[in-house]
């Protein structure tokens, strides 16, 4: 009997070792397992934070969901938010959702989009795109281009939207994608390096908005974190998006780091970020570079002595800091629409 118990214990130990070994191997030879786990963080249901304001706003907004746009990539759908009673072509806000490049969905900004359309009378386009690692850089910025081309070429849409007044924006990874696309439209050499033609004229691009965007990604090579989970998260996202385990030395990392690719033609920009578990130092570097170029910038950051403000804080409308950021964003859009 004692011998049988020992055999069972030994078998269990060997099984656990085998499973742990397989997990470690899976996590080190491919980004897919870790990317799946990270994507689950962004897969929860959409929760309305300020139901009172949202319920009022949605009475005055028309939402068309899951419109298909031509693209070689999948997840090529978009949602359109327009003010009711729109009598003339209106300013167009094109928004790219966040999710660490590996997750997220266009529906995540439903509350924000509905309120902004009601308050500013712009049209708001929320775009889906194929996430990493199924599609690696620069797939997402090129898929955004597919969506913009669709919006410009569709005759019915051209009658409703004023492409002479286009605002690009995004949150988290989507902010980086959106502002990279803005850099492509305003920097011919940069566009050439990505093999992309410019679709929007400089004068058509009125402004950009970055909510917690990683705008200077090369900084993460030098950042030290005591958190194993944070290191794992960063490595997963970078490996998945840039397509190489040696992402720290990749040319793609330099290309997606936008501070060195903007010029004086870049449009006026609103930037905000939190001071923990986010990319505030990258946002600050980007804002400082724009100011050096005499580009109009409005920013909202939080110093270390202020309260802790986490990544994507701006959508938690139950908090005063999110409410204030929304007001600043609304005023910014009204000024440049």
Residue ranges of predicted features:
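Tryptophan-rich substrate-binding surfaces of secreted polymer-degrading and adhesive proteins
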Residues: 1
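Alpha/beta-hydrolase superfamily serine-hydrolase fold, recognizing
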Residues: 4, 8-337
């Amino acid at each position: 009997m004692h011998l049988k118990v020992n055999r069972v214990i030994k078998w269990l130990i060997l099984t656990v070792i085998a499973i742990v070994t397989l997990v470690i191997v899976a996590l080190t030879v491919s980004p897919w397992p870790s990317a799946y786990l990270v994507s689950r963080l962004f897969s929860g249901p959409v929760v309305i934070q300020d139901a009172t304001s949202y319920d009022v706003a949605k009475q005055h907004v028309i939402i068309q969901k899951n419109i298909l746009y031509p693209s070689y990539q999948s997840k090529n759908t978009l949602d359109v938010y327009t003010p009711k009673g729109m009598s003339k072509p209106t300013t167009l806000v094109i928004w790219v959702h966040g999710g660490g490049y590996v997750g997220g969905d266009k529906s995540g900004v439903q509350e924000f989009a509905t309120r902004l359309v009601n308050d500013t009378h712009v049209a708001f386009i929320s775009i889906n795109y194929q996430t990493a690692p199924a599609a690696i850089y620069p797939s997402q910025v090129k898929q955004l281009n597919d969506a913009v081309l669709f919006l410009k070429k569709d005759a019915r849409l051209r009658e409703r939207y004023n492409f002479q007044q286009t605002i690009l924006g995004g949150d988290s990874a989507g902010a980086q994608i959106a502002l990279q696309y803005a850099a492509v439209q305003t920097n011919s050499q940069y566009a050439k390096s990505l093999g992309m033609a410019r679709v929007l004229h400089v004068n058509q691009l009125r402004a950009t908005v970055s909510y917690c965007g990683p705008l200077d990604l090369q900084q993460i090579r030098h950042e030290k974190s005591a958190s194993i989970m944070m290191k794992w998260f960063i490595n997963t996202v970078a490996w998945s998006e840039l397509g190489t385990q040696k992402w720290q030395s990749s040319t793609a990392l330099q290309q997606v780091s936008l501070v060195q690719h903007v010029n004086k033609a870049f449009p006026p920009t609103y930037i905000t970020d939190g001071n923990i578990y986010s990319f505030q130092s990258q946002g600050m570097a980007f804002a400082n570079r724009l100011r050096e170029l005499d580009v109009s910038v409005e920013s909202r950051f939080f110093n270390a002595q202020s309260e802790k403000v986490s990544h994507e804080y701006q959508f938690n409308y139950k908090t005063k800091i999110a409410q204030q950021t929304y007001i600043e964003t609304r005023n910014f859009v009204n000024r440049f629409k």
